[in-house]
Amino acid sequence: MVDLFNTERYIPPYTEIIIELERAPVTLPLLSDLASLNAKIQIMDINMAVRRFTPHQSLILDHEKRMKRGDRMILPFTRTSVRYRTLHPGVLSTVVPGCFTGQLPYSMIVGFLTNEQLSEVTHNPFIFNTQNLKKFNVVKNGVSIPQDPVNIGDLTGGGALLGYTHFIENIGSNIFTHDSGITPDDYFNRSFFIAYDFTPDKTLGANNYEQENGTIDLCLQFKKTDKYPSHTNSSRML
């Protein structure tokens, strides 16, 4: 078994792995409380092509020179981690401190889940709603990104859909040839995420920038209070 998020170390440079998934209807959560249900997922077709190549001799010599000089090595692999934070009920504005501390990620994505989604099989844990979120921003080493919080807008109130635009711009839309398949309707009703690409050229770390250290806090403002606690599901890519 291979972690798909860590396959960059196994494939040649400039090789892209594309996985196309067909979204199932929301009535099919692949979870059930029926002990007699013997469901399974069957892969009908899968293929992968790999080619080998020999780098130019000048590149090999350059690597040897850099190693002899003791230059810092940049290893081309990606590490992904997932963290959970609890949001208490009855708040209109809150800060999730220390989402990430120490070595900072070049990308992060945040989704919201309820207690029922985490603990009950009758609730689909793969449906991410806005949970009445109004605005958001992150504070990276004391600096707000963006300077003013992002107003996510809405579909019915004539909003500018700034949240959806921010999401698309921060998931690699300028480096990938395919789109996410998430429409504005999907974004607000079942696939709501807060996404951040911290690289200066919005390449999701494809150019192997030197990583920063520090702290990232998440600031949230809600339209109204909630009676029940919810959770943030934060994943980062290093």
Which residues fall in each region the model found?
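Flexible assembly/topogenesis modules
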Residues: M1-L238
